[in-house]
């Protein structure tokens, strides 16, 4: 597959933009380097790059595009918003309408505030939790990404009762020491951390279903245990549902698992493809937010008519009866086919899937925590990724990321994808990767 124009554009981009990309996840560094593909247009389940190559897309912009690209109901809503002016700096009735839709879908959102990204949403829930509790520390889970604000760019210490260390240059040691990182799905580690630091902990921050080291579901009783342990220590529970809300059902993952947090951060899908974030929770907590309370948060673009219109339209599409069952059906076909081709070629894999999202790990372990996800073979994934790309299948360039199905994917798309999987595994087997466990 010729991608010479992408290569030329990437060379130019590197002279203009840091690293040639505007988000590190778009780089191909994690899959051996080279020029990322420069896309020119997208429609439904497909991308076309600047060289005219067509791809079936499972990146879905890292999750937001559940309706498929350029869904007409959403694009029409954005066009209407543009005609009326995309930014006012004043309240609009669209904000009321969208907030009401979110509250109806996720009842724990007793009050809501719109922001511009998932990073902002998580960052602000932490600030509000600190204001409410009068405490400074938070607990997060290893491998769970919560945006690029300083407080959550923290790696684990050497054990559950140790403070974190900066995971990025520019994050100060003092900030990192306000974060305790423990393994996902391990209540004993959380209990140990709370026993040690509990009186200083403002909140426990968790993805109710992990989306950032692949799709990983909580063990039975884990989230109930998180709530009990946190509340017994006087801490709040914050769910990061930036990836998970409206991904698996027309609600939050909290509705799917049957456990409610004190606060929730949202993003991605709720914007219909435009920049957005939102956070909300119990009234008594949310009343700590300015102008009612002392926790300040503001934003010029927050609640802008374009993002509100796109979000409303997206949720209207997702209310279609049977939509999530169909995503589940397609996901099951894809999972079954990938496993069958892997077995046929002797390639060792493990798949985690929930409805229309799945992750293929090159490991013989069932992945339930970040440590296991780390052991997925990056060399094998890199070869698989490149072979799939050359067969016209667009995946995220990272062994940790999920494949996201959209409502636009057809059975024919899945069959073509599985043909590409068969080819990729055959190449891997020919190179001896079937012998490497």
Curated annotation (Swiss-Prot):
Which Gene3D superfamilies does the UniProt record give?
Answer: Aspartate Aminotransferase, domain 1, Type I PLP-dependent aspartate aminotransferase-like (Major domain)
Question: Which key words tag this protein in UniProt?
Answer: Cytoplasm, Isomerase, Porphyrin biosynthesis, Pyridoxal phosphate
Record flagged with keyword Calcium: no
GO MF annotation list: glutamate-1-semialdehyde 2,1-aminomutase activity; pyridoxal phosphate binding; transaminase activity
At the top level, the lineage of the source is Bacteria
* CDD domains for the chain: OAT_like
| Presence of the UniProt keyword Cytoplasm in the record | yes
Q: Which residues carry this modification: N6-(pyridoxal phosphate)lysine?
A: 268
In short, the EC number is 5.4.3.8
* Compartment(s): Cytoplasm
Which protein family is named in the record?
Answer: Belongs to the class-III pyridoxal-phosphate-dependent aminotransferase family. HemL subfamily.
- Kindly state the subunit structure of this protein: Homodimer.
What protein name does the entry list?
A: Glutamate-1-semialdehyde 2,1-aminomutase 1
Q: Please give the organism.
A: Halalkalibacterium halodurans (strain ATCC BAA-125 / DSM 18197 / FERM 7344 / JCM 9153 / C-125) (Bacillus halodurans)
Q: Which gene encodes it?
A: hemL1
């Amino acid at each position: 597959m010729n991608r010479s124009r992408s290569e030329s554009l990437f060379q130019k981009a590197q002279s203009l933009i840091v690293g040639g990309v505007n988000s590190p996840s778009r780089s191909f560094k994690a899959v051996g380097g080279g020029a990322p593909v420069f896309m020119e247009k997208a429609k439904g389940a497909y991308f076309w790059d600047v060289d005219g190559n067509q791809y079936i897309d499972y990146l879905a912009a890292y999750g937001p595009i559940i309706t498929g690209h350029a869904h007409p109901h959403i694009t029409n809503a954005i066009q209407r918003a543009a005609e009326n002016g995309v930014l006012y700096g004043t309240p609009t009735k669209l904000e009321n309408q969208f907030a009401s839709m979110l509250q109806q879908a996720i009842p724990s959102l007793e009050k809501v505030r719109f922001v511009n990204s998932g990073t902002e949403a998580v960052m602000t829930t932490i600030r509000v939790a600190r204001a409410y509790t009068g405490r400074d520390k938070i607990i997060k889970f290893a491998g769970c990404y919560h945006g690029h604000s300083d407080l959550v760019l923290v790696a684990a210490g050497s054990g559950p009762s140790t403070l974190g260390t900066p995971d990025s240059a520019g994050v100060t040691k003092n900030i990192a020491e306000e974060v305790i990182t423990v393994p996902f799905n391990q209540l004993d580690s959380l209990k140990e951390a709370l026993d040690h630091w509990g009186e200083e902990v403002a909140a426990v921050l968790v993805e109710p279903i992990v989306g950032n080291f692949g799709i990983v579901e909580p063990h039975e009783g884990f989230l109930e245990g998180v709530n009990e342990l946190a509340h017994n220590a006087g801490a709040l529970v914050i769910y990061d549902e930036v990836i998970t809300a409206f991904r698996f059902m027309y609600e939050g993952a909290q509705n799917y698992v049957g456990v409610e947090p004190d606060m929730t951060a949202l993003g991605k899908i709720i914007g219909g493809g435009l920049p957005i974030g939102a956070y909300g929770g119990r009234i008594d907590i949310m009343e700590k937010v300015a102008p009612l309370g002392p926790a300040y948060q503001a934003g010029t673009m927050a609640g802008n008519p374009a993002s509100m219109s796109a979000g409303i339209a997206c949720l209207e599409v997702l209310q279609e009866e049977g939509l999530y069952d169909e995503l589940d059906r397609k996901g099951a076909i894809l999972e079954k086919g990938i496993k069958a081709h892997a077995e046929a070629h002797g390639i060792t894999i493990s798949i985690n899937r929930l409805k229309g999202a799945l992750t293929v790990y090159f490991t013989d372990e069932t992945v339930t925590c970040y440590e296991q996800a780390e052991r997925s073979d990056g060399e094998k994934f890199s070869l698989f990724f490149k072979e799939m790309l050359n067969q016209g299948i667009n995946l995220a360039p990272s062994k940790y990321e999920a494949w996201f199905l959209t409502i636009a994917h057809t059975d024919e798309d899945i069959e073509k994808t599985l043909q590409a999987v068969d080819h990729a595994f055959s190449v891997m087997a020919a190179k001896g990767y079937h012998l490497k466990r």
